[in-house]
Curated annotation (Swiss-Prot):
One Pfam family from the record: SBP_bac_1
PANTHER family: THIAMINE-BINDING PERIPLASMIC PROTEIN, THIAMINE-BINDING PERIPLASMIC PROTEIN-RELATED
Species annotation: Escherichia coli (strain K12)
Keywords: Periplasm, Signal, Transport
GO terms under cellular component: ATP-binding cassette (ABC) transporter complex, substrate-binding subunit-containing; membrane; outer membrane-bounded periplasmic space
GO biological process, alphabetically ordered: thiamine transmembrane transport; thiamine transport
Location of this chain's protein in the cell: Periplasm
Notes on how activity is controlled: Transport is inhibited by the sulfhydryl-specific modifier N-ethylmaleimide.
Keyword Phosphoprotein: no
Chief site of localization: periplasm
Residues engaged in binding thiamine: 59-60, 161-162, 197, 215-218
Record has Nucleus as a keyword: no
Highest rank taxon of the organism: Bacteria
Protein name: Thiamine-binding periplasmic protein
Length: 327
């Protein structure tokens, strides 16, 4: 009788010892073997007595699209990889809960006062090029767009990618009502528009373009990991558009306490030290930057719309872009 009951007893008691799983939706380059994801996973699991499950999607806008589709049935406990340009749209979904993280725990340009979304890094959009191949890079966004130079350009889709959305807003800041004409000119130099950052940067490294939309911090990877200094970010006279990447916990999470603990962990040194050489962005906490970051392009001017401005105009500007590049 005891032998018959033993398997049943084990089945009944096994869940008691199973570790809880915290599911984090993020973008592919964060979760990749070469991204900060593995380091973050190891550090958090060492402290939480849980399993951290990273679910990778193509890019930041795709995260919001996926969450909208899944709604309250989403398996995500935390969404990591939205940004300052999606704050208003993300808030209006009603799918996120307050973070419990103090605003003064983070340090980003312009400050931070949102009680739902927590920054984990920041950076500036830029066009990266190979100095060995491009001797006279554009000195401004207008030069990139309007020059007679036959530069080959790759950027990301603003409907699926946060860098792509960043370029959309950057163009709008510089050109205003003339943005559609600027997009038409840039289209003549555009090799392709990708869904996400990883694909675009990979094509650039294969020699498919002269310039690729990325970040002022991207050359740090080549400097530190490859010991190469031939990649640089073009420094544009109009300034560079700021991106602050954020995470938030979902209101429907089955692990609300773990999700809140993860957000607190996100602004700690254990997470933040993985950002400069894992995500190749600037950390939001006071951690030491590695040697090599001092060589990076430093924008003289920071460009940014408010989240409300982006929310009010984003769809209209995307429609303008679609019409312009399809002509």
């Amino acid at each position: 009788m005891l032998k018959k009951c033993l398997p049943l007893l084990l089945l009944c008691t096994a869940p008691v010892f199973a570790k809880p799983v915290l599911t984090v939706y993020t973008y592919d380059s964060f979760a990749a073997d070469w991204g900060p994801g593995p380091v973050v996973k190891k550090a958090f699991e060492a402290d939480c007595n849980c399993e951290l499950k990273l679910v990778a999607l193509e890019d930041g806008v795709s995260l919001l699209n996926r969450l909208r589709m899944e709604g309250k049935n989403s398996k995500a406990d935390v969404v990591l990889g939205l940004d300052n340009n999606l704050l208003d749209a993300a808030s209006k979904t009603g799918l996120f809960a307050k973070s419990g993280v103090a605003a003064d725990a983070v340090n980003v340009p312009g400050g931070w006062n949102n009680d739902t979304f927590v920054p984990f890094d920041y950076g500036y959009f830029a066009f990266v090029y190979d100095k060995n191949k491009l001797k006279n890079p554009p000195q401004s966004l207008k030069e990139l767009v309007e020059s007679d130079q036959n530069w080959r350009v790759i950027y990301q889709d603003p409907r699926t990618s946060t860098p792509g959305l960043g370029l959309l807003l950057w163009m709008q800041k510089v050109y205003g009502d003339d943005a559609p004409q600027a997009w038409q000119k840039l289209a003549k130099k555009t090799v392709t528009v990708t869904k996400g950052w990883s694909e675009a940067y990979g094509l650039f490294l294969k020699g498919e373009s002269d310039l690729v939309l990325s970040y002022t911090t991207s050359p740090a990877y080549h400097i530190l990991e490859e010991k190469k200094d031939n990649y640089a970010a073009a420094n544009f006279s109009e300034g560079h558009y700021l991106q602050v990447e954020v995470a938030a916990r979902t209101a429907a999470s089955k692990q609300p306490e773990l999700a809140q603990k993860f957000l607190q962990f996100m602004v700690s040194p254990a997470f933040q030290n993985a950002i400069p050489t894992g995500n190749w962005m600037y950390p939001v906490a006071n951690v030491t930057l590695p040697a090599g970051f001092e060589k990076l392009t430093k924008p003289a001017t920071t460009l940014e719309f408010t989240p409300a401005e982006v929310a009010a105009q984003r769809q209209a500007w995307i429609s303008e872009w679609q019409r312009a590049v399809s002509r």
